[in-house]
Amino acid sequence: MNDVFLKALPVLQKLTTAGFEAYFVGGSVRDYLLNRTISDVDIATSAFPEEVKEIFQTSYDTGIAHGTVTVRENNEFYEVTTFRTEGTYEDFRRPSEVTFIRSLEEDLKRRDFTMNAIAMDEHFALQDPFSGQLAIQNKEIKAVGKASERFHEDALRMMRAVRFLSQLDFELDKETEKALESQIELLQHTSVERITVEWLKMMKGKAAKRAIELLLKVKMETYLPGLKDEKSALSEFASWDWEKRTTEESIWLGLVVAVKPNNVNAFLKAWKLPNKTIQLVNKAYQDALKMKETWLKDELYHAGKAVFSLVNELNVIRGKENNQHKVSQAYEALPIHSKKDLAITGADLLKWSGESAGPWVKETLDKVECGVLSNEINNEKIQIKRWLGYHEE
């Protein structure tokens, strides 16, 4: 049995010893059945939150309104959630009310897909009222109950369906795909932040190309930031070899290269990306458009290692030669990598000249930077001083 389950087993045992039901549920059970890596576990129980808190010496009310208590066991923290049913969904994401219950099956009934609605007890026996194991065996993503109801409850489940297709290389069952297509407009009610998370997970999957093809088939792109009417661009984007991707930034660079938005900055901001990512992708965009494989010395210098590495990564994804080693060698051979590497500063110029500060200081440093970069002058203080015409003291 997987070590992650064995380590968490005392949590289940304490709950069952106290007279309650307790199970591992959700993605960890699914991934165990698929022989995938398991990083953490979710635990569901018939014990109500206050009852859970009485059983464990250390607990935290991390999501008690929805039945979740975090407990500490053997110096590890585990989320324990009470079986529950949910009322109507008012915003296509959150239920209007949550009712704690004692029935495992009723709890599993509210979950998104049958493969995620399997529970495993302390003896590692499975409870599978919705035939999730069969769906896994058939490599099928099938909604629990009516797919239309599950998507209406939380519209993000539609993106999760496409993401799971990519990650697991599964297919959607006919009813689930039909509901996905008929209710796709509900995705507009989902926050961009949640969409971005699912998009990245989808792109990191082994079947990203098929996932994008399904996404286009159901017109999901209409409700993704900046991708409305970009079907042909996304088809091109999907055709590249994304299994060669090593960074998240290459996904965003690839997307802007395919879509060619008028304002790259605004396009990336619409996805709510970190400023650091936006700046890097924006800087790399023009070079990536040219599919630059050879770099002049000043181009390498002004681009910087992060940019040329990212451009090279996208080139490889797009089927070009991997020039990372060659370009890295050329970059490392540069006499300087930024103006900060110069052997002189503005203070030196003021001292040597005896003049007051002004625009001339920056202009002179720029001149020295160009001189050093072109090997016209060595990056040594005394040589630079002579080169600028200042006499030895």
From Swiss-Prot:
Domain of life per record: Bacteria
Listed GO biological process terms: RNA repair; tRNA 3'-terminal CCA addition
Disulfide bonds: none
Catalysed reactions listed for this entry: a tRNA precursor + 2 CTP + ATP = a tRNA with a 3' CCA end + 3 diphosphate; a tRNA with a 3' CCA end + 2 CTP + ATP = a tRNA with a 3' CCACCA end + 3 diphosphate
Pfam families the UniProt entry points to: PolyA_pol (PF01743), PolyA_pol_RNAbd (PF12627), tRNA_NucTran2_2 (PF13735)
Keywords: ATP-binding, Magnesium, Metal-binding, Nucleotide-binding, Nucleotidyltransferase, RNA repair, RNA-binding, Transferase, tRNA processing
Entry's Gene Ontology molecular function annotations: ATP binding; CCA tRNA nucleotidyltransferase activity; magnesium ion binding; tRNA binding
Binding site for ATP: 27, 30, 111, 154, 157, 160, 163
Documented EC number(s): 2.7.7.72
Gene3D superfamilies: 1.10.110.30, 1.10.246.80, 1.20.58.560, Beta Polymerase, domain 2 (3.30.460.10)
InterPro entries cross-referenced by the UniProt entry: Bact_CCA-adding_enz_type3_sf (IPR050264), CCA-adding_enz_C (IPR032810), CCA-adding_enz_firmicutes (IPR023068), NT_sf (IPR043519), PolA_pol_head_dom (IPR002646), PolyA_RNA-bd (IPR032828)
This protein's record includes keyword Metal-binding: yes
Subunit structure: Homodimer.
NCBIfam families the UniProt entry points to: PRK13299.1
Name of the protein in its database record: CCA-adding enzyme
Organism: Listeria monocytogenes serotype 4b (strain F2365)
Lineage of origin: Bacteria, Bacillati, Bacillota, Bacilli, Bacillales
